[in-house]
Design a protein with these regions (language model features):
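Bacterial N-terminal signal peptides
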Residues: 5-14
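Extracytoplasmic
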Residues: 539-689
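N-terminal Rossmann-fold NAD(P) dinucleotide-binding loop
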Residues: 33
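Conserved beta-strand-loop-beta-strand element in the redox core of flavoprotein oxidoreductases
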Residues: 144-159
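Flavin (FAD/FMN)-binding glycine-rich loop and adjacent Rossmann-like elements that form
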Residues: 120, 158, 162-164, 168-539
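Beta1/beta-strand and adjacent pyrophosphate-binding region of the FAD-binding site
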Residues: 20-30
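Sec/Tat signal peptide C-region and signal peptidase I cleavage site
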Residues: 15-19
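Conserved N-terminal/central alpha/beta ligand/cofactor-binding core
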Residues: 45-46, 51-142, 146, 183, ...
Length: 689
């Protein structure tokens, strides 16, 4: 339904004398692209890496600094991905700085975080050491075909020719220029039998009027009809920037006020805040150097993503993409200005956002604004194999694997619809689909066939980034770690094909597999992850004196989709769980306990305080016909040097079955469940006479 062919002119004339030659040309220096280039060069191929912008590394060096591998099977992410992270850690060691993470610790949930300029330095060093020639500001203008093979490329930096080509762009620009079939948008549920396809409405409808006084949809609304629920369409998930921010005065650059700011653009957000709608803002992840990674909130209602602004990006020429890039930047600066200044935003929230600035030591060439737009999804190859939901969840094994992917299926908004009967709803989000009882996605093998065009269309092109997949499958594949691994597979295949003069479809898989393993790539599926079942209540929770009773999340009865994590330290026990900001009332935890003596017990709570946490977590202690209710602001720090924050004192008696319950009903932000402490204060009851 969405298949389209040529967007660039196919040249059938010879390239000019002086065309730069290589055995392998990679177009697009994304993570998949630069790993493909390095892998090909390490196989002995002469490699040229062409990048249409001035920025090398895509999102991995352009602001996405909270590595999404925390939700993946890291033990299967080896090869260049692992080496890249080892070298990032070594960069900190060599400079005498604290190491932000240990790449040897593959435990899911642990944060692997870094600063953008460190990631760029490591990427450039690896490319240089491999002998890759890098050409930036090199925009593709046309493709020369000789039958079913690419003969050469014309670019803004001259002509280039190679034996084998790799499309490393997020957009699939080279495959489109070569006349290879591709798709855009979303499939219907019947197309590949995907339950997650079609329209998606996981977020609550905002109880606001989505129209202005004249009856027109408000700004930031994309339409009034999302289309048939079972059907696909040409929408792609929203794009945004990954901001690198700080509150450190020594490194803070003030965020500039946007030119031509129109407060009316955010009337939808203003109405939502007035109606008590949660999720107006964006996520912040801590980074080294007192920095923060700002991301579009997948659970949010209005966030950094310009919903609807991504749909024409794939077909735009260089000038139009520059205009769309500026439109996304303008929206980002305007949204930041709205959050920092608009009276509709609660004062505390305004102050929190107003304390943020750009980082003086990041992205100096672009005035400290990120150089790379987060193109989460664009064209997708329609080649020899199409990965779908079934390949991820039901049939993960393949005969010709080149990499293992395991990020949860996870899509951001595609539409924002004003309902004629009242209300505004975001459509298109697929909330993370993980293996139940774990914090990771399903592991599956990515087949070599998924990066191959049909041989009758092109015999010397590999497509590891815009690879063959449905929208649902791309919602899992679209992560830098997966693209790095798939790119490495493409690079090895390209070098082998070039050396032997083969079409990429004719390369014997056993030969490819041998060289992939030699480069440290993992192609075998990992053992299934250990699922964390909802634990039963302990008959007697661990007790210490004078610490009292410790109620760890491990002994709670959990209901709903809690996610285990060890991202933030310190924590009590093996880790903690959180609700992924669902705010749906379905995440509930119950502790059952008894106390040994009658006393006034001080209740303390362990959690990792952060600006992204909920400010109103409801907690109830009940037993013996008495009930105590309280709310906890998890943005508030714990007392210095303490593991628990005191919440209050409660009179408890022995022999009574008590319950302590909490839920994410009515919460805004992450709910963190680590542990509680019940510490006797020594105020015992007098003995009966």
């Amino acid at each position: 339904m969405f298949r389209t062919l040529l967007t660039l002119t196919l040249l059938l004339v010879a390239l000019p004398v002086g065309a730069k030659e290589a055995e392998v040309i990679v177009y697009g220096a994304t993570p998949g692209g630069f790993c493909a280039a390095i892998a090909a060069a390490r196989e002995g191929a002469q490699v040229i890496l062409l990048e249409p912008t001035s920025h090398v590394g895509g999102l991995s060096t352009g602001g996405l600094s909270h590595c999404d591998s925390n939700q993946m099977r890291r033990e299967s992410l080896t090869g260049l991905f692992e080496e890249w992270h080892r070298r990032i850690a070594k960069d900190y060691v060599d400079r005498g700085e604290p190491v932000p993470y240990d790449p040897k610790d593959k435990t899911a949930g642990i944060r692997w975080v870094f600063e953008p300029h460190v990631a760029l330095r490591v990427t450039q060093a690896m490319l240089q050491e491999a002998g890759v020639t890098v050409v930036t500001d090199c925009q593709l203008t046309s493709v020369q075909m000789a039958g079913t093979r690419i003969a050469g490329l014309r670019t803004s930096q001259g002509a280039f020719t190679a034996k084998t080509y790799i499309d490393g762009t997020y957009e699939g620009d080279l495959m489109a220029g070569a006349g290879v079939s591709w798709v855009i948008g979303r499939e219907g549920r019947a197309d590949y039998g995907e339950a997650l396809a079609g329209k998606r409405y996981p977020k609550p409808t905002m109880a606001i009027d989505g129209f202005d006084a004249t009856g027109r949809p408000l700004p930031l609304v994309t339409g009034v009809d999302a289309g048939a629920e079972e059907a696909g369409d040409r929408n792609v998930m929203t794009f945004s920037f990954r901001l690198c921010l700080t509150r450190d005065p020594a490194n803070l650059v003030p965020i500039p006020q946007p030119a031509n700011y129109d407060s009316a653009k955010f009337e939808l957000a203003r109405r939502a805040l007035k109606a008590g709608v949660r999720g107006i803002g964006f996520d912040l992840y801590p980074l080294p150097g007192k920095k923060l990674d700002g991301n579009n909130s997948i659970y949010g209602q209005v966030s950094l993503g310009l919903v609807g602004g991504s749909n024409t990006w794939h077909a735009a020429d260089a000038a139009e993409r520059a205009r769309l890039w500026e439109a996304h930047k303008q929206y980002t600066l305007e949204f930041l200005h709205f959050l920092r200044t608009d009276p509709a935003v609660p004062a505390k929230t305004r102050a929190d956002y107003a304390s943020l600035g750009f980082c003086k030591d990041e992205f100096a060439a672009t005035a400290h604004f990120p150089p790379a737009l987060y193109v989460r999804e664009s064209r997708r190859l329609h080649g020899l194999y199409i990965l779908s939901q079934k390949d991820i969840i039901d049939s993960p094994a393949k005969d010709d694997p080149i990499a293992i992917s395991s990020f949860p299926i996870d899509s951001h908004d595609c539409q924002r619809v004003a309902l004629k009967g009242g209300g505004v709803v975001n459509e298109g989000t697929i909330l993370p689909v993980r293996v139940p009882g774990t914090g990771v996605g399903y592991a599956y093998q990515v087949p070599y066939r998924a990066i191959l065009p049909r041989p009758e269309q092109c015999g010397n092109l590999l497509v590891p980034v815009a690879l063959g997949s449905t929208h649902v499958a791309m919602s899992s594949l679209r992560i830098e770690g997966a693209w790095m691994a798939i790119g490495q597979g493409a690079g090895v295949a390209a070098a082998l094909s070039a050396k032997r003069g083969l079409n990429v479809q004719d390369l014997p898989y056993p030969e490819l597999r041998t060289r992939l393993l030699a480069q440290g790539q993992t192609v075998e599926l990992p053992t299934p992850p250990i699922r964390k079942a909802a634990p039963k209540a302990a008959e007697k929770p661990p007790a210490t004196s004078p610490a009292g009773l410790i109620l760890d999340d491990q002994v709670a009865e959990l209901e709903g989709a809690w996610t285990p994590s060890t991202n933030f330290k310190p924590h009590i026990g093996k880790g903690y769980v959180h609700d992924e900001q669902r705010s749906d009332g379905k995440c509930r935890a119950t502790f059952r306990f008894k106390v040994p003596t009658e006393d006034d017990y001080e209740l303390g709570m362990a959690y990792s305080a952060h600006a992204t946490r909920t400010t109103r977590l409801p907690i109830t202690i009940a037993g013996g016909g008495v009930e105590h209710r309280l709310t906890v602001d998890q943005t508030q720090p714990l007392p210095a040097g303490e593991s628990f924050r005191p919440l209050g004192q409660f009179r408890l008696r022995p022999g009574v079955d008590y319950t302590l319950t909490l839920s994410n009903e009515g919460t805004v932000g992450f709910v963190i469940l680590d542990a509680f402490q019940l510490r006797p204060t020594g105020t015992t009851a007098p003995k009966p006479r």
